[in-house]
Design a protein with these regions (language model features):
Chain B
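N-terminal lobe/hinge region of extracytoplasmic solute-binding protein
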Residues: 43-99, 130, 211-212
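Surface-exposed binding/hinge segments that line
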Residues: 141-194
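Long beta-strand-rich cores associated with HINT superfamily self-processing modules
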Residues: 507-532
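Structural transition elements
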Residues: 334-367, 383-389
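Ligand-site clamp/hinge motif
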Residues: 224, 232-278, 302, 404
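Periplasmic-binding protein-like
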Residues: 303-344, 386-390, 491-496
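Extracytoplasmic/peripheral linker and loop segments enriched in polar/acidic and small residues
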Residues: 314, 326, 400, 406-415, ...
Length: 293, 532, 328
């Protein structure tokens, strides 16, 4: 009996213990540094960007130069400043989106896993259904119906991303609940809330953190795609996706569209590096299965 | 496992049925790999499906569809290449107008043949006009005020209007009024009866076949392209120069790249800046001109009571820097001096246009008694991004005067109903001519189409309305021109309408092509285009 | 059963979505003057059944659906079924090509990464695969178009064929197959040239995904005793990898491949818009922005059915590759 308890706890502790190892990987460090720099940029954009991102200068379509590090766009706005300010839109929104999706998905998945029965059935059928409809179609329909705008785009993406999280959380809760040491705890008469906080939560928390890192990257991608299609950010907002969309109209001035794209790549890559390293430290399978779509 | 397989088979067969049924309906493209004659490619960043527009009586008066309707269908009158001021004969060899400009009699040519060889007569004209009226779809307004459309004999067609309408010869040039082969269409579900809106079933037929007498016929159509073939039996003196014309739906950004590698190709959707970037390319001819479409702003009294305050509107009027708007609107762009575009009868000159005067704007704002006004600037996000640029400029202009404008650009599906439902505040919108005549611009007057969208209702400005009525009914062009100029001068002083610019428009073609000339009515005369 | 549930769900959702919009599709879709003409608006609403109460509209829609009738698109004014039949082959050709590319590349790279675990090769492949998963497809498509078409002229531009090349006789709607069937080799070459760039752009994300998952699945198998046994027996490394490791690792890889069809659909919306590819990605984007309800529901239903089908095939393949499941 005691052997079982040790075994189960072992897996968790090994995982946590592996994290410092993950930090030693160069790519993890790159990811961490990149992500941290973008967070700093998002916080400090008003002070570090050389110009007002909306200010229209007389010099249109200027190639990158000392005066304008990344050139100017079709209205004479400084692309560098706009890219920096873009972080202030994408990062907080992606975080808001991920926390909303985790609150909804985590609660529903947790309930489904813990209670089982018809609750489980309803939640999982709902999740299946959202899974079957492609993300962007659903998001486009929602945004088209509610009207474009970043907030509506966030709602739309939350609507399509909770099921992935619900599945993982449900799976983790189930596995933990079925494990011997929770059963033992019950036999020994420990109350339900104790089982939840002491046994279930710690086992669920790790993978969920990994998933969150990966989801932030995905959220940024999807939000920028909606903005690119004209369904997210609205001009003149300096949002990366809509900046790329403007750039597409002006191929000759390649810098208008290329740099916002580089910004998206770098921040999503940062979160993916982080998430990937953390995932190696935890049980990869559960996350893999849930994140397929 | 057993259950799974059964379910799978069930689903597979379901999908199979669905697709099988669907495939039965779809036209299979024909294969003739060896192009007998030359092919012309025209690219347009088209807003929607070509397939919707293949019935001229429904899909006509669509700027993007007009070039191929014009190539497939012949209308009663037409214009000489490059002209839009004097209607000349086409299917009608001549016409006469009564002195009161209410009755128009068209003599129909006897030698016009449809593409299937049938001879065209006045019955076909009567059918076409009645069908357009009774389908009551988009182009129906072309026949507003018409009380009678009759073939009095095989080669005479008479139109009667309830009010004097000297614009009728201009209206009948419209590609939506291209003459349809009535026998052929009736045999395939076409109807011109009064209940045609419900009984006409020719839409699908027109999706596969064209029924006109023009220099080209439609060979195939789908969402991405329309293929036109030369009409082998074309009755006119000038045979089409190309065996095939392909009208493709291509994004502007892609057009910019593709044209640099092409031959026999024309790009219609390049912005002024994009076109300007091609000027150095010796293989291309870039033609930039002033579009007859006007971009205007309006202050909606229905949503913003301050718009009823003429001083407030004037603060906006004199606060806008028109030249800064022209600067972002591409090569060929010009300020719109009034609502009537500079190309048409009755237009104001550039010297008469409103000029920016920040001091005057500020004093007008003070006179209005409104402190620190904030207004929402509503507009449609356009594919070229022009409206975004204009709105950003206007916002900056008005900030100089002390008016805060919050930009609210929306995609067309949201913005258009708001605009049409008079829900804009400070609106930014466009007007493309329905026909090249100042009568089309009556829409901007109180109680009319655009007027109502600005909450500017009948009785709001009696002097303007009276002048408008006289200008609309005047029969001779000299009088009309003068009255329309007076009308617009008044509009520029007292109306909530703020004409802004006529954008620059560019047509880029490979330089082996000739006669790539823009028309405000059908955009491009495909049949006239040739090669050196 | 799942299908019926899905159809009901998708249609209810689309109905609710498009009807919380305060705007009238008649006013949005009619021309400038016609939209202010009460008769034209009334005729439009009658034609599309918009004059009936919402529940009635829904029942009518379901009734038609039973006969395989998806209604008429408000945008194209054709049967949605006709529209889909026209656009699906284009998307199928693009999606299948990109999936094949992504599988071949992703699984190969994943196996290599696992065998070279934590060495330089593994790190490089990690950057490549995560890079593929981190690059916005719309941006990648534009950059690829700029570089490979505009600057280098290695590939032709947008569309499925050059303008002057006529499509092959309709058989499957997939131009590569149809042209070969008709013996039109020049058309085949042209269609492959047009296909290659959008398919690669579309494959980038899934390639990364498959590399990551193959790597972890293979790593897990490599730790097993029978792999060590096989190696100890002196079997060639390739035989070990393909006969033992890859087979044992395939269930999780298959799962991911099945789920990844969702990514492909998202990608096609963006890629088709940029490459003027006349498929359902472009169609659905235009339908959604025009609030064309019948078209939106039609596309959603179709894609959902494909998704379910693909994942059922994956379930069946499970049985083929995994002896334990076959026994059960």
């Amino acid at each position: 009996m005691s052997a079982a308890v040790i075994n189960s706890n072992n897996r968790l502790t090994t995982a946590w213990r592996r994290i410092p190892g993950a930090w030693r990987q160069p790519l993890t460090v790159v990811g961490l540094v990149l992500a941290a720099s973008w967070l700093v940029v998002a916080l400090l954009a008003p002070w570090i960007s050389p110009q007002d991102p909306l200010a229209q200068g007389p010099a249109l379509y200027q190639a990158p130069s000392a005066a304008h590090l990344l050139g100017t766009d079709e209205l004479g706005r400084d692309v560098f400043s706009r890219v920096l300010w873009g972080a202030r839109i994408s990062i907080p929104l992606a975080m808001l989106l991920v926390s909303l999706a985790f609150t909804i998905g985590g609660t529903l998945g947790g309930l489904a896993g813990y209670l089982g029965g018809w609750v489980d059935e309803v939640v999982m059928r709902g999740a299946d259904f959202v899974f079957a409809v492609p993300t962007i179609l659903l998001a486009m329909a929602v945004v088209a119906a509610l009207g474009p705008g970043l907030f509506h785009a966030v709602l739309a993406v939350v609507l399509v991303s909770w099921p992935g999280i619900a599945r993982v959380v449900r799976g983790l809760v189930r596995t933990t609940m079925e494990s011997e040491y929770v059963a033992v705890g019950r036999l020994l008469g420990s109350p339900t809330h104790r089982a939840l906080t002491v046994d279930v939560l710690p086992n669920v928390a790790g993978p969920v953190i990994v998933l969150a890192a990966l989801e932030i990257g995905n959220a940024i991608l999807l939000l920028s795609a909606l903005s690119f299609l004209g369904l997210g950010a609205r001009p003149p907002d300096a949002e990366w996706g809509s900046m790329v969309s403007t750039g597409a109209q002006h191929f000759e001035a390649w810098w208008i569209g290329v740099f916002p794209g580089v910004a998206i790549v770098s921040i999503v890559l940062a979160f993916n590096f982080l998430g990937d390293s953390l995932r190696d430290a935890f049980d990869p399978k559960a996350i893999i299965k849930a994140r397929g779509a | 496992m057993q259950r799974r397989t059964t379910l799978l088979i069930a689903i597979l067969s379901g999908v199979g049925l669905l697709l099988g049924a669907a495939c039965g309906n779809s036209a299979s493209p024909s294969s003739t790999s060896s192009a007998a004659a030359k092919t012309l490619v025209v690219d347009d960043a088209y807003t929607w499906d070509f397939s919707k527009d293949t019935d001229p009586s429904r899909g006509g008066v669509d700027f993007d569809a007009d070039p191929f309707f014009h190539a497939i269908y012949d209308s009663l009158l037409t214009f000489k290449l490059g002209d839009s001021a004097t209607p000349i004969p086409l299917v009608a060899e001549s016409y006469t107008a009564s002195a009161d400009a209410k009755t128009f009699t068209f003599k129909i040519r006897k030698d016009v043949k449809f593409a299937d060889g049938t001879a065209l007569n006045a019955r076909d004209v009567e059918f076409t006009y009645n069908r357009l009226l009774n389908l009551h779809d988009n182009p129906v307004y072309l026949l507003d005020g018409i009380t009678s459309m009759k073939a009095t004999d095989d080669y005479t067609f008479v139109l009667v209007s309830s009010v004097a309408n000297p614009a009728i010869p201009f209206i009948v040039t419209n590609p939506a009024l291209g003459i349809i082969n009535s026998k052929l269409l009736t045999a395939h579900g076409g109807s011109a009866a009064t209940d045609a809106a419900k009984t006409d079933t020719a839409h699908d037929f027109l999706g596969t076949t064209s029924v006109g007498s023009g220099p080209y016929t439609m060979a195939s159509v789908n969402t991405s392209q329309v293929v036109l073939k030369a009409n082998a039996k074309y009755w006119g003196p000038d045979k089409p120069n190309f065996g095939t014309v392909i009208f493709r739906n291509v994004a502007a950004a892609t057009q910019l790249i593709e044209i640099q590698k092409a031959s026999n190709q024309i790009e219609l959707s390049l912005s002024g800046d994009q076109a300007a970037s091609l000027k150095g390319n010796s293989k291309l001819t870039v033609t930039s001109f002033t579009s007859p479409n006007i971009t205007f702003a309006f202050c909606n009294q229905k949503t913003v009571p301050a718009c009823g305050n003429v001083h407030f509107v004037n603060a906006i009027r004199y606060g806008i820097d028109y030249q800064s708007l022209v600067s972002v609107a591409g090569a060929g762009a010009a300020q719109a001096p009034g609502v009537v575009p500079t190309q048409f009868l009755g237009a104001l000159t550039q010297a008469q246009a409103v000029k920016r005067d920040v001091a005057k704007a500020k004093s007008e704002l003070q006179a209005s008694g409104i402190a620190n006004p904030t207004i929402q600037l509503d507009y449609t996000i356009s594919s070229t991004g022009l409206n975004d640029s204009l709105a950003a400029k206007i916002k900056a202009n008005l900030a100089d005067v002390g008016i805060t404008a919050n930009l609210n650009g929306q995609p067309s599906s949201i913005a258009t109903p708001n605009y049409r439902g008079a829900k804009y505040q400070l609106g930014l919108a466009g007007w493309a001519p329905d026909y090249p005549d100042p009568n089309d611009y009556q829409a901007f007057l109180p109680g009319q189409l655009v007027g109502k969208r600005a909450g500017w209702l009948t009785g709001a400005a009696p002097a303007i309305e009276d002048l408008g009525a006289r200008a609309g009914a005047a029969a001779d062009n000299a009088t009309r021109g003068k009255l329309y100029q007076q009308l617009q001068t008044l509009l520029n002083q007292e109306s909530p309408m703020l004409p802004l610019i006529q954008p620059g428009q560019s047509v880029v073609g490979t330089n082996n092509l000739t006669n790539v000339i823009y028309s405000p009515v059908w955009y491009l005369d495909l049949a006239a285009i040739g090669t050196h | 059963m799942a299908l019926v549930f899905l159809c009901l769900g998708v249609s209810v959702m689309a109905f609710v979505l498009t009807h919380i919009v305060p705007n009238d599709p008649a006013v949005a879709n009619l021309g400038d003057r016609a939209s202010s003409d009460p008769v034209a608006v009334r005729l439009y609403r009658e034609h599309f059944g918009l004059d009936k109460p919402l529940p009635v509209q829904y029942v009518v829609y379901l009734g038609n659906l039973l006969h395989g009738d998806l209604g008429e698109s408000e945008q194209s004014r054709r049967a949605v079924r006709t529209d889909l039949a026209e656009y699906i082959p284009a998307t199928a050709e693009l999606a299948i090509t990109s999936m094949v590319l992504a599988c071949l590349l992703g699984i190969t790279l994943g196996v290599i990464a696992a065998l070279r675990r934590n060495r330089l090769t593994d790190q490089v492949l990690r950057v490549v695969s995560l890079g593929g998963m981190s690059t916005p497809q719309f941006w990648l498509a534009l950059v690829a178009l700029y570089v490979f078409f505009y600057q280098l002229s290695w590939v032709p531009g947008s569309g499925r064929l050059d303008a002057a090349v006529l499509p092959p006789p309709h058989l499957t709607g997939l131009f590569t197959i149809d042209s070969l069937a008709a013996g039109q080799f020049d058309v085949f070459v042209n269609s492959v040239q047009h296909l290659i760039l959008p398919a690669c752009v579309l494959a980038a994300f899934n390639m990364g995904l498959f590399t990551r998952f193959t790597r972890s699945a293979v790593l897990e198998v490599l730790e097993n005793d029978y792999v060590r046994t096989a190696r100890a027996k002196g079997l060639p490394e390739l035989t070990v990898v393909f006969r033992h490791v890859l087979r044992a690792a395939s269930p999780p890889i298959l799962t991911v491949v099945g789920l990844a069809f969702g990514n492909v659909m998202t990608g096609t919306v963006l890629v088709e818009n940029i490459f003027s590819w006349p498929g359902i990605g472009q169609y659905s984007y235009r339908s959604a922005t025009a609030l064309d309800l019948p078209a939106i529901v039609g596309v959603m239903l179709f894609v959902a059915i494909v998704y379910i089908l693909v994942n059922m095939v994956v379930d069946i393949l499970y049985g083929v590759v995994d002896p334990r499941i076959r026994l059960a």
